[in-house]
Structure formats: structure tokens, C-alpha cells
Swiss-Prot record:
Keywords: Chloroplast, Plastid, Ribonucleoprotein, Ribosomal protein, RNA-binding, rRNA-binding. GO terms for cellular component: chloroplast; small ribosomal subunit. Signal peptide: none annotated. GO terms for molecular function: rRNA binding; structural constituent of ribosome. Residues 91-154 form the S4 RNA-binding domain. The gene is rps4. This is Small ribosomal subunit protein uS4c.
């Protein structure tokens, strides 16, 4: 299944707010509409797991195959499969750029990476799925061209605090990965255990 490129509002209307996909909030449904929709059909456990899986896929902007591969990697690692899955997704380069506040969405971050504008530890990295590590530092190749845009994004984003595992220096225009993030620093409302359960027969 390919990466979704359709209307983003349609997705958040169905799944709720997904900050990585769009900075728009999910539309509020009228109570009568909610009662009517829930009374018309009983929500199955499969659908609940499916929707949690879709939240991860659309928020991080990855394909079905990519998400399944991340689940398989998480299953082989020691520790909580769900928590490791979230760590793998959060440490992607495109997500780190987004969480630093350098772009308003993950698709915007992915575009910067694909166009070879991002340096990791001083070297160009053009792979959005590149897995960042503690002490990696992220900078923009053409600072003069993007300085005003990045600064504006940072100013808007820092109204909501940057996660503890990251640091951004406005003076040096440089982001730093301090450590692997903990569960509380995830920027998405998600039940990762339901995602693991969804893939239980495939991973």
C-alpha cells in the first residue's frame, strides 16, 4: 500500500487529530451525530485495532509495508514491543525534524530530506527513514535560504514545548538528539498495544 496523498482533513475527521500529518485539528462532531453513528453500528475489536494502526501510519506518513517491518523489528528487540515500535518511528529523521519544530508537518520534513537540504553530523542524508541516534545533530545545508522559514516554524512550535529528548539551538540553527525518548514524550495519542495486536498474525 502506497503512502497516502489525498485530502488530510478526511483522515483526521475519521481518526482524530494527527499532528504529523497536518496542523489542523479534527472537526468536532455534534453530540447527536456521535450518538446516531455509534447506535447504528457496533464497533468491533478489529476495527478499533485497525484505527489505531491507521493513526500510526498516517501520523508518521509511512506505508503499510514499512509499518509492518517496524513491528517485526520491535518484536525481535528486548523490551516492550509497543514502546520499542514507537521509539523506532520517533527516531526517524523526518520525524525528528518535525519534532524539533523545523517544519509544521512530517511531509514537510520529508520534502527537505528528499531534496538533500538536511545534514546529520555534517553529512547530507536524503533518506527520511534514517534512524537517528543519541548525540546526532541536525542542520540545514542552505541556512540562508531557509533561515526565515525555519525560524518562523521554530517560533510557532516552541509555544508547545520541544520534547525532552531533543534540543534546538536558535543561535546555531542546530537540532540535537539527546537520548532515546521515553513513552511520555510521544507526540501522539495512541494505544500502541492495539497496533501490536493488529499485526500479531503477520509479524
Amino acid at each position: 500500500m502506497s503512502r497516502y496523498r489525498g485530502p488530510r482533513v478526511r483522515i483526521i475527521r475519521r481518526l482524530g487529530t494527527l499532528p504529523g500529518l497536518t496542523n489542523k485539528s479534527a472537526p468536532q462532531l455534534k453530540p447527536s451525530s456521535i450518538n446516531q453513528s455509534t447506535s447504528n453500528k457496533k464497533i468491533s475489536q478489529y476495527r478499533i485495532r485497525l484505527e489505531e494502526k491507521q493513526k500510526l501510519r498516517f501520523h508518521y506518513g509511512i506505508t503499510e509495508r514499512q509499518l509492518l517491518n517496524y513491528v517485526r523489528i520491535a518484536r525481535k528487540a528486548k523490551g516492550s514491543t509497543g514502546e520499542i515500535l514507537l521509539q523506532l518511528l520517533e527516531m526517524r529523521l523526518d520525524n525528528i525534524i518535525f519534532r524539533l519544530g523545523m517544519t509544521p508537518t512530517i511531509p514537510g520534513a520529508r520534502q527537505l530530506v528528499n531534496h538533500r537540504h538536511i545534514l546529520v553530523n555534517g553529512y547530507i542524508v536524503d533518506i527520511p527513514s534514517y534512524r537517528c541516534k543519541p548525540q546526532d545533530f541536525i542542520t540545514i545545508k542552505n541556512k540562508q535560504k531557509y533561515e526565515s522559514i525555519i525560524s518562523k516554524n521554530i517560533e510557532l512550535y516552541q509555544k508547545s514545548k520541544i520534547a525532552n529528548h531533543l534540543t534546538y539551538s536558535s543561535l546555531e540553527k542546530k537540532g540535537l538528539v539527546n537520548q532515546i525518548l521515553d513513552r511520555e514524550s510521544i507526540g501522539l495519542k495512541i494505544n500502541e498495544l492495539l497496533v501490536v495486536e493488529y499485526y500479531s498474525r503477520q509479524a
